[in-house]
Design a protein with these regions (language model features):
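Glycine-rich Rossmann-fold phosphate-binding loop(s) that bind the pyrophosphate
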Residues: 8-9
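N-terminal Rossmann-fold NAD(P) dinucleotide-binding loop
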Residues: 12-13
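Conserved acidic E/D residue at the C-terminus of a beta-strand in Rossmann-like folds
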Residues: 30
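Phosphate-bearing ligand-interacting subdomains
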Residues: 36-136
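Single conserved hydrophobic/aromatic residue that forms the stacking wall/gate
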Residues: 138-148
Length: 148
């Protein structure tokens, strides 16, 4: 499966390593040439220096209907726009978008009809996981979810 990662920071780099080790065909776009060079030295991936939400950058990755796009830059708006462009202009298979600002909520329809398939908020994921852990610690019966 082809995966296009938008953002070569900690999350994007870690994701690229994990996907390559599982046999995925990975391309990654970022404006940071040093981050791209570092990944390219260690991994068999296509690196593209460019803006994640620019159609020209996405086109260089050969994104198509068999590609899953995962937008994990540090900018919510870039991630959202990049997913919209990838879906509408390149007809990619799936889009996964990381957001950090809770103002965007979880209603995917606000981003356009089917433009974003999966919305991920690391902050919400951590909050929910910690809440579940605390619940388990203070509940004598793990099946009892009254505290959650």
């Amino acid at each position: 499966m082809k995966v296009l990662i938008l953002g070569a920071g900690r999350v994007g780099g870690s994701l690229a390593r994990a996907l390559v080790s599982n046999g995925y065909d990975v391309a990654i776009i970022d404006q940071d040439k040093n981050a791209l060079n570092s990944l390219e030295e260690k991994l068999d991936i296509l690196t593209i220096e460019g803006h994640a939400s620019h159609p020209v950058s996405i086109k260089k990755s050969s994104a198509d209907e068999s590609t899953t796009v995962i937008a994990v830059t540090s900018n919510d708006e870039v991630n959202i726009i990049a997913c919209q462009i990838a879906k509408k202009s390149f007809n990619v298979k799936k889009t996964i978008c990381r957001i950090t600002d809770s103002a965007y909520g979880n209603d995917l329809t606000v981003f356009g009809d089917n433009a974003i398939d999966i919305l991920i908020s690391p902050e919400n994921e951590v909050k929910n996981h910690l809440k579940d852990l605390i619940c388990l610690l203070y509940t004598s019966d793990a099946a009892d979810d009254t505290c959650c």
